[in-house]
């Protein structure tokens, strides 16, 4: 496998820390050891997160093309668009963000606080669009790029989650390589890695990276899209493409992509009771915050799988904390009493 042949522009602090979740593990019976790899602490650029790791491989391409404007898309409380805005500010580039109405959640401040507030503060041109949730290529995004061209600019397209970008899976191939180095220092290997999946390239990159040592199917995706067939297809497609890019040396199969579909409801962006219990439990036992759109659902999945005995006794499970906490203020009504 050869990731090193791709240029990488450093946007992160370096390897993200692995933190033992001792109190949560003990609360759940102590038979499974839980750890978190803190991608939410990976950068000083507007709270960072998993997209910042991905963007390290997109930025060299944008600079090589002479682009002057990063154009991306997400929901109103998109972590992706906030991270793109931060990178644009860091590089001295312009930024256009399409923010669609992906979540059926009504709150007077939903489009004024959290991620979208930070994007505006960083100087992004934020464009609210009424279109609903979809993880594919969007007309509104293509129209935004055309508007940049018509104004004399040179846009660089960054799709939702970086996922449909040809290089979108590379960052999390690097994640797997980083984990292997940390495992050597820790003196053990993780039996499972739990990760939230929606647009797919985070899990896809992990699948490829861990396939290099036979652990592709030990990456347990927790669907938060509530459109699992679409997400599974996209993860698989991106993983196959990424495997070819890095010369993995073996094909990615359907069996390599594990996606647990039990925790996404009621729909994208809306938490269920299990999501909320997981968010509060993790906060109160570990002081680690998760959000109701993504990480709360993957945390719910991990906790429930431990409770059901789906991880063998003695297993060491690594939870990939991808970020998302800046969106919490947009859900303040839900958490008004903690």
From Swiss-Prot:
Similarity section: Belongs to the ACC deaminase/D-cysteine desulfhydrase family.
UniProt keyword annotation of Nucleus present: no
Cofactors (names): pyridoxal 5'-phosphate
Residue ranges that the Swiss-Prot or TrEMBL entry lists as coiled coil: none
Taxonomic classification: Bacteria, Pseudomonadati, Pseudomonadota, Betaproteobacteria, Burkholderiales
Protein name per its UniProtKB record: 1-aminocyclopropane-1-carboxylate deaminase
Active site residues according to the UniProt entry: 78
SUBUNIT field: Homotrimer.
The reaction(s) this protein catalyses: 1-aminocyclopropane-1-carboxylate + H2O = 2-oxobutanoate + NH4(+)
Function according to Swiss-Prot or TrEMBL: Catalyzes a cyclopropane ring-opening reaction, the irreversible conversion of 1-aminocyclopropane-1-carboxylate (ACC) to ammonia and alpha-ketobutyrate. Allows growth on ACC as a nitrogen source.
Pfam families reported for this sequence: PALP (PF00291)
Biological process terms in GO annotation: 1-aminocyclopropane-1-carboxylate metabolic process; amine catabolic process
Enzyme class of the recorded protein, top EC level: hydrolase
Source species of the chain: Burkholderia ambifaria (strain ATCC BAA-244 / DSM 16087 / CCUG 44356 / LMG 19182 / AMMD)
Name of the coding gene: acdS
Keywords noted in UniProt: Hydrolase, Pyridoxal phosphate
EC number(s) stated in the UniProt entry for this protein: 3.5.99.7
């Amino acid at each position: 496998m050869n990731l090193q042949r791709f240029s990488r522009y450093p946007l992160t602090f370096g390897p993200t820390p692995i933190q033992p979740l001792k109190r949560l593990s003990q609360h759940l019976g102590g038979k499974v050891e839980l750890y978190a790899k803190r991608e939410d602490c990976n950068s000083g650029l507007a709270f960072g997160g998993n997209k910042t790791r991905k963007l390290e491989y997109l930025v060299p391409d944008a600079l090589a093309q002479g682009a002057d404007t990063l154009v991306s898309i997400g929901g109103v409380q998109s972590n992706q668009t906030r991270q793109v805005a931060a990178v644009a500010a860091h590089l001295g580039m312009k930024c256009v963000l399409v923010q669609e109405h992906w979540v059926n959640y009504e709150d007077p401040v939903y489009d004024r606080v959290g991620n979208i507030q930070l994007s505006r503060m960083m100087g992004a041109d934020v464009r609210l669009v009424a279109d609903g949730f979809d993880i594919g290529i969007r007309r509104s995004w293509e129209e935004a790029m055309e508007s940049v061209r018509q104004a004399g600019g040179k846009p660089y397209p960054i799709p939702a989650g970086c996922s449909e970008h040809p290089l979108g899976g590379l960052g999390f191939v690097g994640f797997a390589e980083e984990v292997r180095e940390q495992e050597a220092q820790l003196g053990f290997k993780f039996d499972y890695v739990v990760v939230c999946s929606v647009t797919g390239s985070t899990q896809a990159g992990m699948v490829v990276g861990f396939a290099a040592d036979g652990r592709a199917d030990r990456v347990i995706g927790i669907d938060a899209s509530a459109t699992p067939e679409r997400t599974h297809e996209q993860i698989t497609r991106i993983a196959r493409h990424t495997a070819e890019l890095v010369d993995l040396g073996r094909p990615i199969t359907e069996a390599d992509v594990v996606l647990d579909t039990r925790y996404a409801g009621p729909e994208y962006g809306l938490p269920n009771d299990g999501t909320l219990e997981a968010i509060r439990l993790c906060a109160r036992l570990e002081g680690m915050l998760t959000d109701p759109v993504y990480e709360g659902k993957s945390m719910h999945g991990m906790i429930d799988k431990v409770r059901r005995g789906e991880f063998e006794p003695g297993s060491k499970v690594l939870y990939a904390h991808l970020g998302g906490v800046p969106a919490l203020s947009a859900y303040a009504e839900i958490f008004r009493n903690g």
